[in-house]
Amino acid sequence: MRRLLLSLLVIGVAGGLLPMATAQAKPKPATPAIRHIFVINLENTSYDETFGAASPAPYLSKELTAKGQLLSQYFATGHVSLSNYITQISGQGPSKATQVDCATYSDFVATGTGDLGQVLGDGCVYPASVKTIADQLTAKHLTWRGYMEDIGNSATEPKTCRHPAIGGPDPTLAARPGDMYATRHNPFVYFHSIIDTPTCAKNVVGLDALTADLAKPKTTRNLSYIAPNLCHDGHDHPCVDGQPGGLVSADAFLGEWVPKILASKAFKKDGLLVVTFDESEIGADSSDCCGPTPTPNVEQPGIQGPGGGRVGAVIVSPFVKPGTTSDTPYNHYALLCSMEDAFGLSHLGLAGRPGLQCFGNDVYNKKT
C-alpha cells in the first residue's frame, strides 16, 4: 500500500520444510441459520472519519447503519493492506513481506508451524498446506466466489484468477486508466491451495458476475467476497479516471451494489452482509482490540503498534435488528471465526485463539 515502507522494512526469506496449518476447535456461540455471507472491504479509513457527524459517506454511515447494526469497536489486525486481507480468509498473521504489500510476488518459504497454525517464515504466496475458508467451504461442498472489480480489464492478463508470476513484480501497485484492479486486495491469489487448481479461474472472477449470481439462491454463493477497484474502495483520491475517490466514491459504489445484494432472495432468506475496511490510515492508528495476538513472523502487526486501528463495520441481516449498535470488540480474526461458525467450520489460525469472541447474541439480536 505505501511504497515508502519498502525502504523501511527488509523482506527476509528463510528456507525450510512445508508446514501443515491446522484448524482449531473451540466452543462456538449460538449462530442463526446463515447460509449466504457477503463481505465488502473498503480501504484505509478511520472509524471517526467514516461514521462521524461530518462523514462524506452518508449511505454507509446513515442509511445502511439504519438497516442493520454498527460494530463501533471493530478493528483491523495490522498494516498495511495485504496482511488484513490474508487474515480475513486464513487466520494467518502478517509476514515481513505482506507488511509491505508484496511488491514482489514471492513464494512464502516456510520453516515450520507455530502455535495456532501460524506458518513460520516469510514471503507472500502460502504453501498448498495452508488453508483458507475457501478451501474449508469446498471440502464441505459449499460454494464461494471472490468478485474483483476490474480483474478482467487488462488486455494482456487473464480475465479471472489474475496474479503476477511467482517471483515477479506486482504491476498493480498503482492504478492504470481503465484498469484499477489491485492484486493485494484479492487474498485468494496468495494461496497455492487456490491458484494451483482450476478452482481459481472458476471462482476468482470479475465483479460483473455478481449480478447474474444473485438472480437465484442456487446460484448465489455461500460466501461472496467483494473487492472494489482502487477508486471504488476509497484507496485512491483522486482517481486516475477523474473520479473523486476516497469515501465519496466508496459510498457511491455501496449505493449501487448493496441494494442488489439486499434485494436478492438468498440474502432475504438467510443472508449476512458485512461492510468494513481493511485498515485505518497507517501512521494515524495502529491500535488493536481483543487481547494479545501472537504473530511470530513480525514484531508489530501494525508496524508501529499491535494492530491496524479502529475502522468499524456495518452488519445487515434478517437476523440483525435494524438501527442497533454493538460495542463488543471485534477484528478481522473475529470476522473469520464468525463466518466459520455460520457454516459449521473449524477455526483457522488466529481465528481459533482462546478468548477471541466471535459474533454472538449482541450481533444476532433479532428474532425471526
Can you describe what each PLM-predicted range is?
Residues M1-A25:
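Secretory targeting and sorting signals
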